């Protein structure tokens, strides 16, 4: 990376406007709290808006620090995939015997329903 610092006038202006806007909204809520119709909700907002302004400045500061730091070296000796013996084996479904009486009875019932449906022409599918 280069050793010269980048100048970001548009970003600095955006952060400054955002922080000043948050402080102005905090001042507005403070004056609303002090008025005759002010509530504790206005006080809460009056205390929150300066925190939002501080958050704008904090995130800009972190952005600049992150951008100026050198990129982290990639470790090529890292494991890129999970070894198959690390995970437990997936359970397999039990095989039904082909002469299962309950399955045979159920299939017969389904065949009767299909036959009745075909006789009555009550098709619900296209």
UniProtKB/Swiss-Prot annotation:
Domain of life, per the record?
Bacteria
Gene that encodes it: lprD
In the record, which residues receive a covalent lipid, type N-palmitoyl cysteine?
A: 20
What protein am I looking at? Putative lipoprotein LprD
Keyword Signal found: yes
Family (UniProt): To M.tuberculosis Rv1343c.
| Lipidation residue positions, type S-diacylglycerol cysteine | 20
Q: Where are the transmembrane segments?
A: 44-64
Identify the stretch annotated as signal peptide in this record.
1-19
> Taxonomically, what lineage is the organism?
Bacteria, Bacillati, Actinomycetota, Actinomycetes, Mycobacteriales
* Keyword NAD part of the UniProt annotation: no
Protein topology in the membrane: Lipid-anchor; Single-pass membrane protein
Report the principal subcellular site.
Answer: membrane
Its subcellular locations are: Cell membrane
Q: Per UniProt, which keywords does this protein have?
A: Cell membrane, Lipoprotein, Membrane, Palmitate, Signal, Transmembrane, Transmembrane helix
One cellular component (GO) term of this entry = plasma membrane
């Amino acid at each position: 990376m280069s050793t010269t610092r980048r100048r970001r006038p548009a970003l600095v202006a955006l952060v400054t406007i955002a922080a000043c806007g948050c402080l102005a909204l905090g001042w507005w809520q403070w004056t609303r709290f002090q008025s005759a119709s002010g509530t504790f909700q206005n006080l809460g907002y009056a205390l929150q808006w300066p925190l939002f302004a501080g958050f704008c400045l904090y995130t800009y500061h972190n952005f600049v620090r992150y951008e100026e730091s050198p990129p982290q070296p990639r470790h090529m000796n890292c494991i890129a995939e999970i070894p198959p013996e690390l995970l437990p084996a997936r359970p397999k479904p039990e095989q039904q015997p082909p002469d299962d009486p309950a399955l045979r009875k159920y299939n017969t019932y389904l065949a009767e329903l299909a036959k009745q449906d075909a006789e009555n022409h009550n098709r619900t599918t296209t």
